[in-house]
């Protein structure tokens, strides 16, 4: 009995090993459009796919970011300026992509553009603080996807949406975690709808990697700004010691983050080039060994764990 079980497990492992390594043919003829290529995951993925011979269409927010990327890549790579919060910018970029891909369609759409601030305790913020993050991370991603979808459908291609472990476990307030939960939900519904057209949708869920999103300096500046704008009543409830401890934790974030971004971009590349891409990719050991298991625990256990490890306001009961 045990021998048969071991044999079945071994056979399954062997089949899975070969299945995940099957690669799509004629990659050099396939176009991939990537948002957020000024820095971080976006610029690294663009360079990675360019080295592989794919035709990369890289969207950057600034001309400086676009120029720096062009200087590090081959003549195959093309850049366009895109602000995902502006409809007219998305329309212009979509027309630009159409002119490049022609009748082939767009093989890959990678929604990578994102921001993390303002974030912090919810009652330190105003409605526009939430809206600012949601406009980029969720609504912008949705509008880009809807605009590019006819091109992706024509190629029977791939949509790769960058979420986060914060799309599974909400550790802090503000628009970031909300937006990533939204990315997960939108991607799930999109995957089921597009399966009828041969289009595959993958979600990337990175742990903590050192990018602009996790920059200690940026997060500390954001936290201080939120503290300064909140009411005296809220500042009294939380207290100066809470703020100091909060900033101290944020200052240590750079050291906690993984500096090797290829752990994420390799997942993106697999989602674009594999014959059998996964539905979800947990990038980073912290994602695989902590945040993913944490997301499957009963809510009361997660709440208890976070209660005992989180900072307490000065006026906490």
Swiss-Prot record:
S-S pairs: none
MF terms (GO), sorted A to Z: 11-cis-retinol dehydrogenase; all-trans-retinol dehydrogenase (NAD+) activity; androstan-3-alpha,17-beta-diol dehydrogenase (NAD+) activity; androsterone dehydrogenase [NAD(P)+] activity; identical protein binding
Segments crossing the lipid bilayer: 289-309
Family matches, as CDD domains: type2_17beta_HSD-like_SDR_c
The keyword Oxidoreductase appears for this protein: yes
Domain of life: Eukaryota
Enzyme Commission designation: 1.1.1.105, 1.1.1.209, 1.1.1.315, 1.1.1.53
Location of the protein in the cell: Endoplasmic reticulum membrane; Microsome membrane
GO biological process, one term: retinoid metabolic process
Catalytic site positions: 176
Main localization of the protein described in the UniProt heading: endoplasmic reticulum
Keywords: Endoplasmic reticulum, Lipid metabolism, Membrane, Microsome, NAD, Oxidoreductase, Steroid metabolism, Transmembrane, Transmembrane helix
Pathway(s) per entry: Cofactor metabolism; retinol metabolism
UniProt-annotated binding residues for NAD(+): 33-57
Pfam family, one: adh_short
Alphabetical list of Gene3D superfamilies matching this protein: NAD(P)-binding Rossmann-like Domain
Swiss-Prot/TrEMBL catalytic activity: all-trans-retinol--[retinol-binding protein] + NAD(+) = all-trans-retinal--[retinol-binding protein] + NADH + H(+); 9-cis-retinol + NAD(+) = 9-cis-retinal + NADH + H(+); 11-cis-retinol + NAD(+) = 11-cis-retinal + NADH + H(+); 13-cis-retinol + NAD(+) = 13-cis-retinal + NADH + H(+)
InterPro entries listed in its UniProt record: NAD(P)-bd_dom_sf, Sc_DH/Rdtase_CS, SDR_fam
GO cellular component: endoplasmic reticulum lumen; endoplasmic reticulum membrane; organelle membrane
Family in the record: Belongs to the short-chain dehydrogenases/reductases (SDR) family.
Function: Oxidoreductase with a preference for NAD. Oxidizes all-trans-retinol, 9-cis-retinol, 11-cis-retinol and 13-cis-retinol to the corresponding aldehydes. Has higher activity towards CRBP-bound retinol than with free retinol. Oxidizes 3-alpha-hydroxysteroids. Oxidizes androstanediol and androsterone to dihydrotestosterone and androstanedione. Can also catalyze the reverse reaction.
Protein's name in the database: Retinol dehydrogenase 16
Naturally occurring in which organism (per UniProt): Mus musculus (Mouse)
């Amino acid at each position: 009995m045990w021998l048969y079980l071991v044999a079945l497990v071994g056979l399954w492992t062997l089949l899975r090993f070969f299945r995940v390594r099957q690669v799509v043919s004629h990659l050099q003829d396939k176009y991939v459009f990537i948002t957020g290529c000024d820095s971080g995951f976006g610029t690294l993925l663009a360079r990675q796919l360019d080295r592989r011979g794919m035709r990369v269409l890289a969207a950057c927010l600034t001309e400086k970011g676009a120029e720096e990327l062009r200087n590090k890549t081959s003549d195959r790579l093309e850049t366009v300026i895109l602000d995902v919060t502006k409809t007219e910018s998305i329309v212009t970029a979509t027309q630009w992509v159409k002119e490049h891909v022609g009748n082939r369609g767009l093989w890959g759409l990678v929604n990578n553009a994102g921001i993390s601030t303002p974030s912090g305790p919810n009652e330190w913020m105003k409605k526009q603080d939430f809206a600012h993050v949601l406009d980029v991370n969720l609504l912008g991603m949705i509008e880009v996807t809807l605009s590019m979808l006819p091109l992706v459908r024509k190629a029977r291609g791939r949509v790769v949406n960058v979420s986060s472990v914060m799309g599974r476990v909400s550790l802090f307030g503000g628009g970031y975690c909300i937006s990533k939960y939204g990315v997960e939900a939108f991607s799930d519904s999109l995957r089921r709808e597009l399966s009828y057209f041969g289009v595959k949708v993958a979600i990337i869920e990175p742990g903590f990697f050192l990018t602009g999103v996790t920059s200690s300096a940026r997060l500390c500046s954001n936290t201080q700004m939120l503290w300064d704008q909140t009411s005296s009543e809220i500042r009294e409830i939380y207290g100066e010691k809470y703020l100091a401890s909060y900033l101290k934790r944020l200052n240590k974030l750079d050291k906690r983050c993984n500096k090797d971004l290829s752990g994420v971009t390799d997942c993106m590349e697999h989602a674009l080039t594999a014959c059998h891409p996964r539905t979800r990719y947990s990038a980073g050991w912290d994602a695989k060994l902590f945040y993913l298991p944490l997301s499957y625990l009963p809510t009361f256990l997660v709440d208890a764990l976070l209660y005992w490890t989180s900072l307490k306001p000065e006026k906490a009961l």
